[in-house]
Amino acid sequence: MFRYESLEDCPLDEDEDAFQGLGEEDEEIDQFNDDTFGSGAVDDDWQEAHERLAELEEKLPVAVNEQTGNGERDEMDLLGDHEENLAERLSKMVIENELEDPAIMRAVQTRPVLQPQPGSLNSSIWDGSEALRRIRGPLLAQEMPTVSVLEYALPQRPPQGPEDDRDLSERALPRRSTSPIIGSPPVRAVPIGTPPKQMAVPSFTQQILCPKPVHVRPPMPPRYPAPYGERMSPNQLCSVPNSSLLGHPFPPSVPPVLSPLQRAQLLGGAQLQPGRMSPSQFARVPGFVGSPLAAMNPKLLQGRVGQMLPPAPGFRAFFSAPPSATPPPQQHPPGPGPHLQNLRSQAPMFRPDTTHLHPQHRRLLHQRQQQNRNQHRNLNGAGDRGSHRSSHQDHLRKDPYANLMLQREKDWVSKIQMMQLQSTDPYLDDFYYQNYFEKLEKLSAAEEIQGDGPKKERTKLITPQVAKLEHTYKPVQFEGSLGKLTVSSVNNPRKMIDAVVTSRSEDDETKEKQVRDKRRKTLVIIEKTYSLLLDVEDYERRYLLSLEEERPALMDERKHKICSMYDNLRGKLPGQERPSDDHFVQIMCIRKGKRMVARILPFLSTEQAADILMTTARNLPFLIKKDAQDEVLPCLLSPFSLLLYHLPSVTITSLLQQLMNLPQSAATPAPSNPHLTAVLQNKFGLSLLLILLSRGEDLQSSDPATESTQNNQWTEVMFMATRELLRIPQAALAKPISIPTNLVSLFSRYVDRQKLNLLETKLQLVQGIR
């Protein structure tokens, strides 16, 4: 089986540096043993073995009779003869039941005959002292037993003549109990007192080979993982015995333990041909060196070893399906022996003690292996099925997440779930279930009437009839805390605010209430007036669609609604001659009211519209102040401009006096006029003033037949307006919306050239700014 091109290719013949590294590894292992089991666990065993072997060498008759001259050469010849016999006996170590196999006998008989040469044996791997000295170094220089001792220790086999002529290259290496084999895992020490699990050896042979057994085989680890508290550490995992294939046949009760490298090599060879492996690939597995498998024929290994491998190529996952319970039919003679049968049956089994898995992974693997084992038991029909099944089910029923909640917490969750089932009106809260159960009851009643069979009792959900208490949430409110958080809750875990109560007099409360009520009334009036405005705007469409006889009535309704709108704007009460401006000002202070007035002005009569314009001119500074944020007043400029073209000169003069708040006579010295200043600093007020001046000048120039009194009045108004414009600083003037074109000619008739240039500069500057 072990074929090499030359003796130099033998794996035992390596350099001294590699074996020196092995010696250092042995020293580290001894140090680990001392740290683990004490300093006296494995001390001095090799020395005692050396002394006993030295005594045996002295008692040998060959060593006593040899002389100093030719004694060394004769001793080497004698050792060569003994080693030749030893090699022949080792090559015959085949199990009896394997020799009875016809296939094996045919393979043995067809071997060519090779004559061994003593010279090659003396320098081969069978050399006793020198070869082993290169392997172990100075540590075993005087420890190796002689050939006679090894020969005496071998079990006696009956002589077989035809087998003596077999090829020497097929002879297996002898088993070694004291020196490690290259490629095999190192022998680990175990606690003292562990009973050895080895084959029975004669007491005398055992005393010769190992007088005091030091490295004994520990008990095999359990098939399934131990509890989490008893699992081994990574250092302890290294001490698991993994050399059961080294020089010992497999007992039927002990499954073989393969290292991950050996398992990978075995399974890797199966990828080439499913279920088969060549003898050369099998020979490279380091765990089989020196085992009984090494002495077998390569053809026999090719037929036998393939059965130990799984039929599918590649590795099988940890949690894959279990192997088939019934083995496939075999097309070959009976197997070699119980140790290979045991290897074949146990090789695919995963050993959880060879890897360090996560506790959760171990638990899942343990459950999967128990399920596989129960399936095999059910298929084979062996064992107490009832007890094993019940115990397995009890084990699976154990919930690792049980007892995580107290009984009080469970009751609390149950109450929450029951609260959802409480209903005073189940047809409303649980409509679909109630209808479904009614259909089931009707079906059961129909079956009972037909007599098909006994009535089936159906389970019905019984909801507790508990009266619901309607609870309306009323948050705590404090005076003066509008928009602030008043209470602390789960969603708002803040400190309650200190409600600040300000003491106010009754007059202040009454006045505030009046203002609030007045604003509400104003809003109501605006909404009513808007409704009238929409109806009036719709009358044009209704007028076009109506008949001739219906149109007068529509016109009357329209006039009536227009008067109602004017009354709502002015707030004129029955029997009151002149309404107050306060009501109109309240409407104009609201943005919606300003826009509504701009839409209503075209529908009003000239007198009504002039009254609205006059009221606006009188209260323009106050309206400008209220419109500072909205700036909606410019929307009134267009309807006011259209209105001015329908007003007479007297009305325009009066409007100009109201707008500028001028005194009755120009001769009186005019004090400071804040009213006019506010109008000139607003774009709507300045634009309205310029439009009035332009329209008045047009009327004066176009109608020369006007009375002199009106002309004098207009002239005085123009002088006062020009004086105010000259007094207002240039920076205080606002940007008007529109500037008439006839302003320069207008002022040229009332002021001299110097003042005219100054006004022209201001107006041009204003026009340029615009």
From Swiss-Prot:
Subunit structure: Interacts (via region A) with DDX6/RCK. Interacts (via region H and region C) with LSM1 and LSM4. Interacts (via region N) with DCP1A, DCP2, EDC3, EDC4 and XRN1. Interacts with the CCR4-NOT complex. Interacts with the Lsm-containing SMN-Sm protein complex. Interacts with EIF4ENIF1/4E-T.
Biased segments, Pro residues type: 324-337
Keywords: Cytoplasm, Methylation, Nucleus, Phosphoprotein, RNA-binding
Gene coding for it: PATL1
Gene Ontology annotations for the cellular component aspect, listed alphabetically: nuclear speck; P-body; PML body
Pfam families for the chain: PAT1
Region (Involved in nuclear speckle localization): 398-770
Stretch list, region Region N: 85-388
Modified residues (Asymmetric dimethylarginine): R217, R223, R263, R284
Biased composition (Basic and acidic residues): 385-400
Record text about domains: The region C, also named Pat-C, is required for RNA-binding and mediates the binding with the Lsm-containing SMN-Sm protein complex and the decapping machinery. It folds into an alpha-alpha superhelix, exposing conserved and basic residues on one side of the domain.
The protein's name in its UniProt record: Protein PAT1 homolog 1
Keyword RNA-binding: yes
Location in the cell: Cytoplasm, P-body; Nucleus; Nucleus, PML body; Nucleus speckle
Motif (Nuclear export signal): 86-95
Omega-N-methylarginine, modified sites: R385
Entry-annotated residues carrying Phosphoserine: S177, S179, S184, S278
Organism: Pongo abelii (Sumatran orangutan)
Function: RNA-binding protein involved in deadenylation-dependent decapping of mRNAs, leading to the degradation of mRNAs. Acts as a scaffold protein that connects deadenylation and decapping machinery. Required for cytoplasmic mRNA processing body (P-body) assembly.
Taxonomic path: Eukaryota, Metazoa, Chordata, Craniata, Vertebrata
Annotated stretches, region: Region C: 449-770
